[in-house]
A protein has these predicted regions:
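Outer-membrane beta-barrel proteins
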Residues: 1-261
């Protein structure tokens, strides 16, 4: 039989007539717009729209060669979270409570290339009851953007992703926050019954504390992989590397096996 929903439980409702889709509740309302591919190893520096599932409302409808989705996120809380993404470094500004409002949209379609673009932003209205004294002037805002493009060339697929996000806050009179930008480029090609791929990526992040911006932390990633089917089993071998500009490097070599029926 049916069980009642427990405290903290979530649900989602989806309604569609084939041309317009409405979503209400805890769902993946917006795409990360990621189109690149990766292998089994670590090393890739993700470049995408930093959004996730959230309890909100969205409408998706056909526009030209693709689909446009518009989403709204409205909730009260004490964490710097909007459109499903938490900016933990800015929780200090929202800890006394407030009303958070976020808006975002995504367009995905075939425009001669497989394209997806997501943009979103959000901010908090600080609680007058909970945020008193120095906290009465607290503020926080978030913005995010992601672009993904994939192009088939013969049997190969070339894909490119670009993403940025910024979380800025004020606590009393002190400003802080973080900003990140990155890109990914991948190429996947058939090799007989197998496939091979390469992914190159880079991210740069800047953190601001007390109104003073720090140096950019830049990390470059490389991943190579080869995947071959062996009956119902797929075997992948790869190499991954993540190098920071200060000279530290993390390297990983390994293999992964998966089975499908």
């Amino acid at each position: 039989g049916a069980s009642p929903m427990t405290a903290g439980g979530t649900a989602a409702i989806t309604l569609t007539d084939g041309s317009i889709t409405y979503k209400l509740g805890d769902a993946g309302h917006l795409s990360t717009a990621e189109k690149t591919s990766g292998g089994p190893m670590a090393g890739i520096q993700d470049a995408e729209a930093s959004v996730d599932s959230f309890n909100g409302f969205s409408v998706g409808l056909g526009v030209g060669p693709g689909t446009l989705t518009v989403a709204l996120d409205m909730h009260a809380g004490t964490t710097a979270t909007v459109l499903g993404e938490n900016s933990a470094g800015s929780d200090i500004a929202t800890g006394c409570g407030g009303q958070i409002t976020g808006f975002g949209f995504n367009f995905a379609g075939d425009v001669g290339a497989d394209l997806s673009f997501t943009y979103g932003s959000g901010s908090t209205t600080i609680s007058a009851a909970g945020c008193t004294g120095d906290n009465a002037t607290n503020a926080w805002g978030y913005s995010v953007m992601g672009l993904g493009v994939a192009v088939p060339v013969g049997g190969m697929t070339i894909a490119f992703d670009f993403g940025t996000k910024a979380s800025l806050h004020t606590v009393g009179t002190a400003e802080g926050g973080s900003a990140t930008a990155g890109w990914e480029l991948s190429l996947v090609m058939p090799v007989g019954d197998a496939s091979a791929g390469v992914n190159l990526s880079s991210t740069a992040a800047i953190t601001t504390t007390g109104g003073v911006a720090g140096d950019a932390a830049v990390t470059g990633g490389t991943e190579l992989w080869y995947t071959v089917p062996i009956g119902p089993v797929s075997l992948s071998a790869g190499y991954g590397s993540a190098a920071v500009v200060d000279g530290s490097t993390t390297t990983e070599i390994g293999a992964e096996m998966s089975m499908s029926f």
